[in-house]
């Protein structure tokens, strides 16, 4: 029989009594020299870190990415250098608008943030369960997220401000259509697709760049929750998706996704009739078919939620040689915003935490800061250039190829492309009658109580996408088409 562990303070000395505070006599006041009590209360006061401003409610798991098809003609990234090669991963799912204690069965996009622990460093693809987003320009992101949160005065959610924003943002229509479709409430995290959403880039050994979209196709099959079931679960089991994911992995029913890409050459992008870097639109799979890359499997639950899920930090700025960014405006905004959020929320040295630490060597000149641990660079120099032969040196061979740009610096109107409607209309026409009816009823229910001016403005967008789309919602809302 194993020996019992001795309880200690955070500094290591043993604790003699964890039941009774020190006091002046059995009925007297407590004593300030009870360092165990003081430490315990002080640490308790500081247990929470700021929750994520978005994607606060989340679940995570470790897994493995396995290469199934050769794509070395597109990328020199070493994790893809041979078929069958495996790379450890960590995947965090989430809702977007809700707080940490909210239900994970709400109608909301789901975050799909994937970290690859590669031999060249960490690579993150920070996506969602939808291929598009509500806005094109990160300048509008704080405004949009405010509409998904709570009113400043009452601290209540508001359909009015949500639809008011969308009715002034016609580019949101494609994502709105997806959100209120049957896929707007996935049945847990295992039964939904994932997407990188943004356009990224791949760079091969010749220095050639291709634009890429990432897709994760669930092998468990798509399953969604009916609104009534989702509402019931929100009251009876608000952690339904977390429970489902954790339980499946614990019993060995490991969820898997088929990983695919779409590829577009730079020449194709330059000549394309649509902006391939517009995250409110998808690429045609007829024009740019899916190419299988590999398989993602989740096979290990975290041992501690706070340490490994709450403190997990993902960012599109985490890249390895052979992958890169694109002129996608939202992606470029996220490159700053995500890393900055982690510095505020988790700390300056968040990359040193085990869940965020790369499995490859780290050789940088960054030093000190809050909660720096390990050797902190030891006695090595903390400046560059320097005269030390064994100090880290830049590696020009990993430079990305030049990207040709044109145009004067200005604030260009990102709404000059006025086609906000064709993609939403095409999606509506792909739906069967049952799916269309569900979409219309979901939207009409969500618009109940919204002011008539907002309803009228939003209805115009539905009509422009497809007359039947607009007519159905107008009828469900009891709005006269006259």
Swiss-Prot record:
Residues annotated for heme binding in this entry: 338
GO molecular function: catalase activity; heme binding; metal ion binding
Uppermost EC category: oxidoreductase
Entry's EC annotation: 1.11.1.6
Superkingdom, natural source: Bacteria
Segments for region (Disordered): 1-28, 370-395
Protein name as it appears in the record: Catalase
Species: Onchocerca volvulus endobacterium
Taxonomic path: Bacteria, Pseudomonadati, Pseudomonadota, Alphaproteobacteria, Rickettsiales
Gene name of this polypeptide: cat
């Amino acid at each position: 029989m194993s020996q019992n562990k001795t309880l200690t303070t955070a500094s290591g000395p043993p604790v003699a009594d964890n039941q009774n505070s020190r006091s002046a006599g059995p009925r007297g006041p407590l004593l300030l020299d009870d360092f165990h009590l003081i430490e315990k209360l002080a640490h308790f006061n500081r247990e929470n870190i700021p929750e994520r401003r978005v994607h606060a409610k989340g679940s995570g798991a470790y897994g493995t990415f396995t290469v199934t098809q050769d794509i070395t003609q597109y990328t020199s990234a070493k994790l893809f250098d041979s078929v069958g090669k495996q790379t450890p991963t960590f995947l965090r799912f989430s809702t977007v608008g809700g707080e940490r204690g909210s239900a994970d069965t709400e109608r909301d996009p789901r975050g799909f943030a994937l970290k690859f622990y590669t031999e060249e460093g960490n690579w993150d693809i920070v996506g969602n369960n939808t291929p598009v987003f509500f806005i094109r320009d990160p300048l509008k992101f704080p405004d949009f997220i405010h509409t998904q949160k709570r009113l400043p005065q009452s601290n209540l959610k508001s359909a009015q401000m949500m639809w008011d924003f969308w009715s002034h943002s016609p580019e949101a229509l494609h994502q709105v259509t997806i959100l209120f479709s049957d896929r707007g409430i996935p049945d847990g995290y295992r039964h939904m697709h994932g997407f990188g959403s943004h356009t990224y880039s791949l760079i091969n050994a010749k220095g050639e760049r291709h634009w890429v979209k990432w897709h994760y196709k669930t092998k468990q099959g798509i399953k969604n929750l009916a609104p009534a079931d989702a509402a019931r679960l929100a009251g009876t089991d608000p952690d339904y998706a977390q429970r489902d994911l954790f339980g499946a992995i614990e019993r060995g029913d490991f969820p898997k996704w088929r990983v695919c890409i779409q590829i577009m050459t730079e020449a194709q992008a330059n000549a394309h009739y649509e902006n391939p870097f517009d995250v409110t639109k998808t690429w045609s799979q007829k024009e740019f078919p899916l190419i299988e890359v590999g398989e993602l499997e989740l096979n290990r639950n975290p041992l501690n939620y706070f340490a490994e899920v709450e403190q997990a930090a993902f960012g599109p700025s985490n890249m390895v040689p052979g992958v890169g960014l694109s002129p996608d405006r939202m992606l470029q905004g996220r490159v700053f915003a995500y890393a900055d959020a982690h510095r505020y929320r988790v700390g300056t040295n968040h990359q040193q935490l085990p869940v965020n630490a790369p499995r490859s060597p780290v050789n940088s000149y960054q030093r000190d800061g809050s909660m720096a641990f390990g050797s902190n660079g030891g006695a090595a120099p903390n400046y560059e250039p320097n005269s030390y032969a064994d100090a880290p040196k830049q590696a020009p061979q990993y430079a990305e190829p030049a990207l040709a740009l044109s145009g004067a610096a200005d604030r260009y109107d990102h709404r000059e492309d006025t086609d906000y409607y064709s993609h939403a209309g095409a999606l509506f026409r792909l739906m069967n009658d049952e799916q269309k009816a569900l979409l219309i009823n979901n939207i009409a229910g969500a618009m109940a109580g919204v002011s008539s001016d907002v309803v009228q403005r939003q209805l115009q967008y539905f009509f422009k996408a497809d007359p039947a789309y607009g007519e159905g919602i107008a009828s469900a809302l009891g709005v006269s088409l006259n």
